[in-house]
């Protein structure tokens, strides 16, 4: 075997394996299995994602949106499985950045990390932009552009303060938010089922799932592809818990398990919720004309108060997602700076007394606030987020597949069966998504992607060690020291 092929993630303790991969432990390893699960599930935020983007599928093909969700969501799950194996083989902070760097070279790895970092930041910004009108609507308040930007910036600041204080605070907040969301959403789902089965409201039959209810004129192929973007918006951010690998106990096993469980759980729960929403829905045109389609559907079924409760849970879930995305984005920057591959690397790689890369956290906040200036192009911001994620993970999947064929990938504690078929399938799917996203809006999304690529080239060109290998010296931190269970 060549490269890292002789390494075995199953046989070595966390910190010892990290040193075999070329890094000294620097972060505090406190996170357990549930925290790793909560980070991944919190990133996906299936309820928040569905509530705020349900119209994406509905406007494309009407009730038939259920089938693109099932099929495209299943393909997203295959990507999740493959990324889980990659993070099991390489349980290193930085996720895709480090994995692609080792398998595809320093330049490609850095660019992949850059794209995913931008996706995390854009998603943080778009989540906060989406939350503001809903929260203010509860109090009968509406804002103009600059008011919206200011309110979104305030939410980003709250997320930043949670993240910069300590890993313990951020993970406890995420854990609590995930538990509350899971319990309450399960109860609401039971309520919807009971209302549909025993209430007086009419229930659509299964044949309704095979109609477009007047939303499609002509060929259905492109509308189905556009509807398939909904699960790609909701079910994404696959390596987020992998970014916290150096802060997770038994990371080679805990992280992939958390990733798989969170993604499969989100997919399953999302499928049930979307099915119930479609069956409970009235006229598609009325639903699309409403301010909040999901609340509009649920209000006559559950009553106004329970429908608003569901909306509140979606808000909680989406804010939890924002907190986790900022946490993950800061770890990508920290990992690149540890390798001395960012301008001001010493600042980005510095850790505060709680072993948090605080400068990186504040920079993600600053860029996210700047992104909110694009709030009038909210849909474009979401599309840019997804296309950057898809591009980054597509590169990760390709390098991982080639590495496995060459025998240069460490033996992972979690492995995908049938990988010779599954990996190429996910690569083709990722390429298809890129084409659909750019074709749908070539001027803004295509140009935005080009700008992101060029900006990455510029930043990489001025990085102090763009041609160097990995930096294995100790941390540049406020309080240097090896990883430990400091609970």
PLM-predicted stretches and their roles:
Residues 26, 66, 142-147, 176-311:
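Helix-loop-helix junctions that connect adjacent transmembrane segments
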Residues 49-145, 151, 262-272, 445-455:
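Extracellular loop-to-transmembrane helix junctions
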Residues 98-99, 105, 137-141, 210-215, ...:
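TM-loop-TM module centered on a large, flexible mid-protein loop between adjacent transmembrane helices
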Residues 147-204, 259-263, 382-395, 421-425, ...:
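Membrane-interface loop-to-helix entry segments
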Residues 173-176, 346-358, 393-442, 470-473:
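C-terminal membrane-solvent junction of multi-pass transporters and transport-like membrane proteins
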Residues 383-389, 418-487:
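A generic transmembrane alpha-helix motif of multi-pass inner-membrane proteins
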